[in-house]
Amino acid sequence: MVHKVHALKILKNISMNPIIEYESLLNTNKQFNDAYLQTFQSVLESGWYILGDKVKRFENEFANFVGSTHCIGVASGLDALMLALKVYDFPAGSEVIVPSNTYIATILSILHCNLKPVLVEPDLDTYNINPTLIEEKITSKTKAIMIVHLYGKPCNMDEIMEIAERYNLPVIEDCAQAHGAKFKGKQVGTFGTGAFSFYPTKNLGAIGDAGAITTSNDDLARKFRSLRNYGSEAKYQNDYIGYNSRLDEVQAAMLSVKLKFLNEITEHKRKLAAIYLSELNEDFICPAVSDVYFDVYHIFNIRHPKRDELKAYLLKHGIKTEIHYPIPPHKQKAMLGIISGIYPISEEIHNTTLSLPISYGHSEEDILRVIEVLNKF
């Protein structure tokens, strides 16, 4: 009976205000629906569904947006990362520097290439890889540095590129969460090889899985195009051990529709982030702000020592949140026997982080309500 009364109280609290979803793709995409339907009809009637004009158009548009010479559309963000490594044909067992605080896909891409991930702890202010810790992890087996612009905030690319150039190591940028982010005015995905995801929840999201690679290296671009299509540059001629990782015409066409609004989406999210940063009280650790970082706030995360209690409290008041991410990569079951070492900074982040609603479908009023509830915790 006590449990029923408690449940009724929660329902009463929620019913007083509409639920604020962490993100609703229906709300995020509703303004694009008419254009999406027309675009889908156009692709359907074209009779060409793989690597056609729609893919070429989006590749050109996204390359121009990023500021790279080439964009190569692929099937997913994970595939983009894998191909960004595969193109170098590193010997099996070679080491790749990678942040310990990231989504598992970053590390999976290394393992799928028969390479060894060497984890580097993040900076606790930015949550991105700490450049001052990279050099001590470089050995004679190190072949590349893979960095992640996590949550939409770019890494410190000055320090990373200086180390990479000194050791003659290629840099692969995981830009899955950072479309349009800039470091000192330069877009991510142009410092090294950029790997992008267009998963539906991303700032530039497709209506399914999709990804892309950006580069200004003509030779790499040619090989990327071959690797994504069975290692073929000419029909029925295969020069490499390739893959089937092609961006399809439907997703490319939908992405072209949404790309036109990406700057608007980014500015909306930055406006919502500014409200959080201005109005949240000091009990919550908010994302660091600096003039050198143009943060696109794919995710707005706060940190709090009572994260789980806070998450439950917000849900009680009709506000849904997420955790990015509840389990760090080195503690995942799949990584047993693969990754060793202790990563206390990553664990601190994973144990205290909470992602708040901040999408194109949220209003300023939504954010003010979240803040009002948070500040009463």
Stretches with model-predicted labels:
Residues 116-126, 322:
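Short beta-strand->loop structural element characteristic of the AMP-binding/adenylate-forming
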Residues 113, 166-167, 317:
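Helix C-cap/helix->beta junction micro-motif
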Residues 102-107:
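Conserved coil-to-alpha-helix start sites within the AMP-binding
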Residues 48-95, 108-113, 119-121, 186:
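Phosphate-binding glycine-rich loop
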Residues 23-28, 37-57:
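A glycine-/small-polar-enriched, mobile loop at the entrance of the PLP active site in fold-type I
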